[in-house]
């Protein structure tokens, strides 16, 4: 297929231009087949480091590696056609220096073909974000609750519920926006703060447990489909697929053990002998 005939993907500048416009729809995906489904309805597919929790059963996102993100990012790119694909930079791949961040981000962009990367952190990461943007790397920011910082935060509690924390997170968002981020994820903050951030920054905000006033929303796909045994308060279950999948597996196991499967329609017959 020629480049001219290929489906055109959304770009970071197009997402940036959606500020105060039609809400931006984002979901996570880690596989080609779910990416193909999500791609039909979403503006952005996030290959989140939450794959550590969802796919690998880690308690936090800290153990996730750059190689894991690249592998799943490539899968999502193969499964999608139109959405902007954003790949999370995992813990330890960008914090040491601006140069480390660029080296890691360049690997992700080159090896997956994705359109942007995401980094967690506010004022402390602003210089790094500007460094990346100035070198051709589109960056999505992430402020509020930053899961990669769980060992210093101590818990996954909502942020910005007192005046001091709220003021700090607002300044984080401003710094990330001014550094050149094309959008900012705002996670698990008090609703008035989510509104205030959205009004204060030039970049579109994408809320996850923030505010309906944000410029867009994101959820973890498995959470909203009912595939996770537990989900945060900010998740709305749009499906309850877990019990249905379990029932299908149970039925399969029962039919195998009773020799009801495979049936005659599931096996191959010999070719008929040629007529003499």
From Swiss-Prot:
- Key word Mitochondrion present in the record? no
Q: Name one GO molecular function term.
A: magnesium ion binding
> Which cofactors does this protein require?
Mg(2+)
Query: Which controlled-vocabulary keywords does the entry list?
Result: Cytoplasm, Magnesium, Metal-binding, Pantothenate biosynthesis, Transferase
| Name of the coding gene | panB
Cited HAMAP family: PanB
Instruction: Please name the top-level EC class of this enzyme.
Output: transferase
Q: In which pathway does it act?
A: Cofactor biosynthesis; (R)-pantothenate biosynthesis; (R)-pantoate from 3-methyl-2-oxobutanoate: step 1/2
Q: Which residues bind Mg(2+)?
A: 49, 88, 120
Q: Which organism is it from?
A: Afipia carboxidovorans (strain ATCC 49405 / DSM 1227 / KCTC 32145 / OM5)
Q: What is this protein called?
A: 3-methyl-2-oxobutanoate hydroxymethyltransferase
Per the entry, what this protein does is: Catalyzes the reversible reaction in which hydroxymethyl group from 5,10-methylenetetrahydrofolate is transferred onto alpha-ketoisovalerate to form ketopantoate.
Which Enzyme Commission number(s) are listed?
2.1.2.11
Q: Which InterPro entries match?
A: Pantoate_hydroxy_MeTrfase, Pyrv/PenolPyrv_kinase-like_dom, Pyrv_kinase-like_dom_sf
Name the family the entry cites.
Belongs to the PanB family.
């Amino acid at each position: 297929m020629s480049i001219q005939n290929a489906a055109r993907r959304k770009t970071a500048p197009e997402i940036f231009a959606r500020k105060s416009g039609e809400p931006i729809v984002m979901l996570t995906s880690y596989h080609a087949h779910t990416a193909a489904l999500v791609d039909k309805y979403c503006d952005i597919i996030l290959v989140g480091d939450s794959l550590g929790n969802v796919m690998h059963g880690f308690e936090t996102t800290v153990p996730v590696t750059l190689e894991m993100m690249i592998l799943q990012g490539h899968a999502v790119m193969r499964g999608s056609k139109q959405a902007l694909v954003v790949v999370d930079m995992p813990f330890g791949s960008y914090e040491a220096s601006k140069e480390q961040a660029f080296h890691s981000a360049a690997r992700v962009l080159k090896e997956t073909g994705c359109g942007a990367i995401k980094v967690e952190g506010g004022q402390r990461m602003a210089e790094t974000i500007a460094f990346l943007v100035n070198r051709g790397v589109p960056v999505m920011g992430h402020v509020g609750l930053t899961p990669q910082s769980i060992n210093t935060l101590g818990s996954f509690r909502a942020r910005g519920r007192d005046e001091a924390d709220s003021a700090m997170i607002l300044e984080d968002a401003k710094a990330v926006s001014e550094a050149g981020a094309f959008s900012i994820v705002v996670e698990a903050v008090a609703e008035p703060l989510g509104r205030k951030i959205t009004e204060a920054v030039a970049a579109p905000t994408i809320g996850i447990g923030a505010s309906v006033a944000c410029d867009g929303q994101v959820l973890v796909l498995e959470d909203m489909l009912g595939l996770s045994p537990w989900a945060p308060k900010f998740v709305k279950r749009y499906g309850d697929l877990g019990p249905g999948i379990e029932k299908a597996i149970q039925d399969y196991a029962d039919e195998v053990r009773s020799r009801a499967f495979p049936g005659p329609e599931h096996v191959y017959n010999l070719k008929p002998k040629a007529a003499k």
